[in-house]
Amino acid sequence: MRAKWRKKRMRRLKRKRRKMRARSK
């Protein structure tokens, strides 16, 4: 159960990181 929501959270974090990087550039 924990692994399931953890995977979803990781994906969201990755998406946020991508947006932040683009803004920095």
Swiss-Prot record:
UniProt miscellaneous comment: Initially thought to be part of the large ribosomal subunit. Crystal structures show eS32/eL41 to be a small ribosomal subunit forming a bridge at the interface of the 2 subunits.
Instruction: Please give the superkingdom of this protein's source.
Output: Eukaryota
**The protein's name in its UniProt record:** Small ribosomal subunit protein eS32
Q: Which family does it belong to?
A: Belongs to the eukaryotic ribosomal protein eS32 family.
What's a Pfam family in this record?
Answer: Ribosomal_L41
One of the GO BP terms on file: translation
**GO MF annotation list:** structural constituent of ribosome
User: One GO term of the cellular component aspect?
Assistant: ribonucleoprotein complex
Question: What InterPro entries does its record include?
Answer: Ribosomal_eS32 (IPR007836)
What assembly does the database describe for this protein?
Component of the small ribosomal subunit.
Q: Which UniProt keywords apply?
A: Ribonucleoprotein, Ribosomal protein
Looking at the record, which segments are called Disordered?
1-25
